[in-house]
Each structure stands twice: as structure tokens, then as C-alpha cells.
Amino acid sequence: MSLPEALELAASRAAGLRPVDGLLPHITGEDGRWELLSPLDAEDAALTGLPWTGGFVAGQLWLAGRHERAAAVTEVLAPRAGQPTTHDLGFLFWPSAVLGHLATGEPGYRELALRAAASLAERALPSGVIQVIGGLDDPEWRGRSIVDTWPNLMLLWWAEREGLAEAGRAARAHLAATLDAFLRPDGSTFHAGRFADDGTVLERGTVNGFAADSTWARGQAWAVHGLASASRATGDSELRAAAERAARWFLDQLPADGVPPWDFDAPAGPKDASAGAIVASALLDLGHEDEALRLLETLVATCLNRSEGDGLLLHCCYRHPVGLGLDCATVWGDFFLLDALVHAVEPATRPDPLREGARARAPSQPA
């Protein structure tokens, strides 16, 4: 299947997404159908944060030009914007409210996204670290951060351009506090860390990876995407070099079939194609078109869902250490694949939070 054909399929699949009684698609279950979550309730008993994936449902619909359904999903998410409870406000409101504003020009989406950005900036600690989840005065969570926060900063970079100066300050401070702690000299990454209020690194390890010192594939992908966005937003040559180093490490570690494993240091286990989609999107933003297209072509050839089941990008892995979603489709994998396909095939239609005047029209799609 060619990339234009894959884009057509992706837009068609995205068009079927919708909220069901306030619940949103998340990952597919063993039956190949979407499992639904409320974006307003805890995902499971072990997670003190709230579900982080709903924005990617809205984002797919905006990218596919299905504005009515995208608006419905964004409305479901809206109560979260004023709740400074998680670093995932970026994932919730960059693909939903920011892309909604870019797609429609509606000022309400801009206001919603700015409210979410202000809430996210409130999670900054004296060290500059944006705490992942938990109350800022909760000793269990104080100072904890994960590399997944870096791509969440997209919301803050956009908000800075919209005049919210504290958003840019928070994003820069977080990167200054965490960059050297998470990015190893060879370009690989730690997933998680904990920081004292003075910035001292107290511990490093993982939440979703194979081992404390392993490189979790999606964490590496989040690093590539977050650093690519940061370098574009700031023009900082050191951040650009860091993004390039992380991307090169990721590409150099890919197995012969070109599909990322769930963890680059795990002796065996499932794939995580979503990590490949995230990196493909970032590579296009970095201007590495040839490498991005090779990665996209591999994912389309080996992981694209051509059956009647739900989801687009198969062979993704959600939370391996707890046995959740070991071989599934995910709404984030589908979002980043669709985003990369739009960027590669019809770049003029892609809404880009970091490009001036980035209003978009819907990609070509069947009637």
C-alpha cells in the first residue's frame, strides 16, 4: 500500500471515532475492538493520574477534517483544562484544543488551550521540574518526572507564541532541569527520575521499561518528539543537537524488520509500532524526510490494520510491566501515524502549532 493510500485509509478509520456516553477509545482489547475510558475518572487503581489519551482521539478527527466529532470529543475533555493535576495536559489539549483552533479559527478553542497551558505551568516545582502527577506537596510524588513530559511541552510552546509568557518559562525550566538527567551521552534515555527542590537528581529509573537502566522504546520516541518540538520552538542549537542524537540512536537500534521493540534492552517481547510512528512524525519536523519515509513505509507494510477490527496501527504495546495492551492498536499510535502521513503526503493541510499561519484544510478523503 502506498503512503497516499495509507493516508486515505487512516482518515477513513479516524472518521469513525466518537465519544460513547462520555467514554473515549483508548487501546484495543483481545477482540480487536476499542476499550473505552472516561477521561474524567482514574484509569485503574494503580494510577493516581487521570487517563491521558483522549486528546489523540480529537486530534485524529481534526486531522481527518471531521470537525463535528472532533468538537464533541474536545467538549468531553474540556473540564480537565482547569485542573493542574497532571503533566498530560499537553497530550490532552495540544491535539484537541490547539489543533481545533488551527483547524477552525474558533477563539473558544484557543481559550481552552491557554487555560490548560496555564494549569500545566502551575505544576512546575522550585527546581523547574514539572511534576508528573500527584499533589505538589505529596511526599510520594514530589519531584517525580518522566521523559514523556517533553512532548507534552508542545502545549506550552504554542501558548508562549500566543502570549502566555509563563508557559515558555516553564517549558524552558523543565528542559534545563531534566535534559542531562534523562538523555544519556550516547543519545539513549532514562524513562523516569526524581529531583530535589534544588535540582539534584535523587534517582533515575523506569516505570514502563524493562529495567531501571534500559531504554524503553516509547520513552525514547517521546524524547525525540519532545526535543524536536523544543528545538523548533526555541531555535536552540543545543536542543537541536540533542534531538538529532536521540533520533540517531533510535534509528540505529531498530531491528532488521524496522519495527521498534517495546524496550531496546529487553531480551524478547512484543513490538511497539507506536514508538515508530512518534519518531516518524518527529523526523519530518526535523527535516529528515528520507528516514521518516522509510520508517513510515515499514509501518504501513507490516503494521497497518486492513481488517474490520478497530484501530489503524497494530502491534503497539501499552504497559508491558503490568501486562496491559501487549499487542494492540492505540489512539496515540494512530494519531502520530496519521499526523506523519498528512505531513508526508499533503503537508499543506497539516495544522502545525509551531508554524506561523498554520491553518489547515482537511486531507483528501473519500466521500
Regions found by a protein language model. Name each.
Residues 1-367:
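Glycan-recognition and catalytic cores of secretory/periplasmic carbohydrate-active enzymes
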